[in-house]
A protein has these predicted regions:
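Positively charged n-region of N-terminal signal peptides that target proteins for export
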Residues: 1-5
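Cleavable N-terminal signal peptides
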Residues: 6-7, 17
Length: 144
């Protein structure tokens, strides 16, 4: 019985050690100011919907992006993949590839994605597309 009591106490204490409040230690630094994008095309499909957009994106210049959204069974969420190109200056074009998840809440499509950029940097993007408007904002945070 004494062994069982000690084992239960150790189990309870180990939970406190593992359950440290990590959320309060996670901080994300913005890569740049939020960027407004304009939707240029939406192609609705049975298995994939493709959304294309363009806009000015700080250090990446004029950016063109394409999001490919696949559906889960609920048709209100799924995975997203895509590509982006940014004309930084006359001789430099940055390329990015991204993967993530999307959900739809009413008329808002929420995308959360990781981006690998050709210069070696990585971003976590938070995007909320309002389907009632032709614009949306990309919030880019540094990962690497």
């Amino acid at each position: 019985m004494k062994t069982l009591l000690i084992a239960m106490m150790l189990l309870a204490l180990s939970h406190a050690a593992v359950g440290d409040d990590h959320a309060s230690k996670l901080t994300l630094e913005k890569r740049q100011a939020d960027s407004v994008m304009t939707v240029t095309n939406v192609d609705l499909g049975d298995e994939v919907t493709t959304i294309s957009a363009k806009g000015k994106m700080g250090i990446y210049g004029t950016v063109y992006v394409t999001y490919n959204l696949t559906y889960n069974a609920d048709r209100a969420s799924g995975f997203v993949t895509g590509q982006g190109r940014g004309a930084v200056d006359k001789g430099t074009v940055a390329a990015g590839a991204f993967r993530g998840i999307w959900t739809r809440e009413g008329s808002i499509v929420k995308i959360r994605q990781m981006v690998q950029i050709s210069d070696g940097s990585q971003n976590m993007d938070i995007i909320d597309i309002d389907m009632l408007k032709d614009t949306f904002v990309i919030k880019a945070y540094k990962v690497r």
